[in-house]
Amino acid sequence: MTTKLIKVTDTTLRDAHQSLFATRFNNSTISKLAPLLDKVGYDVLEVWGGATFDSCIRYLNEDPWDRLKMVRRLAPNTNLSMLIRGANLVGYRHYSEEIINEFVSVSADFGIDIFRLFDALNDPGNLETASKAIKNKNKHLQLTMCYSTGESGKLETKSTEIYTLDYYVNLAKTFVKMGADSLCIKDMAGLLSPYDAYMLITELKNNISIPIQLHNHYTSGLASMTQLKAIEAGVDGVDTCISTVAQKTSQPAIEPLLKTFISNNSTYKININFDQITKIEQTLEEEVKKYTSYSINTKFSNIDSGVLTHQIPGGMISNLTSQLNQNNNLNKLPQVLDEIPKVRKDLGMPPLVTPISQMVGAQAVSNVITKKYENISEQV
C-alpha cells in the first residue's frame, strides 16, 4: 500500500499565540520552546511576521530582529517561515520598493527560508515586488490566497458571486505564473468547510502542479474535519500547533492528526516525534500561565459558530476583545460582532484579513460606541 507523506508546519511560535494571547509570547518563552520544537521533525516552523514584529516593539520592548536571529540559532535543523502582508510587509500601509527589497533581504539573511506572502485584497499586483525580492534571494516563495465567502458562507460556483471556485482557480494560476514555489490557502476565520475544501483542492490540483498548503483556524469548529478532507483531496501540507495553544481561534492540534495517521489502515503518514511533543506540552502548560490576562474568554464554548456570519479571523478576535476590555466596553462585543458584516458589505465585501480586518473592526467599534459612521477613519 502506497502512503503519502503530509508535511506539517507548526504555528506555536507565531499564529497560535497571536490568535489566543494577542501575540504576547516574549523572547524568554520563545527561547524555551524553539529548541524543543526543532527536535520534533516538523517540516517548517512559522516563527515571525504577522503581528509579531509590531507586538515586540509596541508591547514587549524587544527587538524583533533579535528574536529572529535567536530562533534561527536555537532551531538550526528546521525550515523557518514568516508571514508577509505583501506591500504592507509587517505594517499597515504600503511601503516603497526599496524598503520591501531590503526587508526581504535582511529577513532572508537572518534565517527565514520560506516566505508566506499574501495581500488582504487578493490583488496579485500588491505581491509582485516582494515576490521578486524573495526569488532574488533564492528563498521559497509561498504565494497565498485569502479564503473568504459571500453572505451564503459557502464556496460558490455561480458566476454572480465574488468568491467562486473559478475565482480561486484563476488566482492560483496567476500565482504560478508569478513564480510561486507553493500555494497556501489561508482560511483565517475558519470558514472553509470540509466538503468545500475537498472541492476546492481537487479543482486546484487539476489546474496547478505546485504543492498546496492549508492554513486554517479552529474558530468555527470545522478545521480538523476540513484538514482531513483536504488531505483526502490531495493537499500536500497543513498547519497545526501544540495542543496547549490549539483550537478556539488558533489552529488545529497536531496530536489528534498524528494519531489519525498512526492507524495501520491509513494511506497517509506524518514524520513527527510524538514523545517530543509531550515534552513541549509540559513546558507550554507552565509558560502560558504568564499570558492568561491576554486570553479573555467571553463564553464557555470552545468554538464560535457566529464566525460563519461575522467572519472575523482568529488573530483579530483576541485583539478586539482585549481592546474592548481595556476601554471597559467588553459588554458591547456582541453588538460589534453584529456590526462587522454590515460594515464589510458597505465596503464591498473584502476578505477580513490584516489590515482590512482591523479597518473594518475599528469602524464597527466606532459605529457601536458612537453614531453610525459619525467618525470614519482615514483608512476606510
What do these predicted regions represent?
Residues 1-116, 120-380:
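Catalytic cores and adjacent flexible loops of soluble metabolic enzymes
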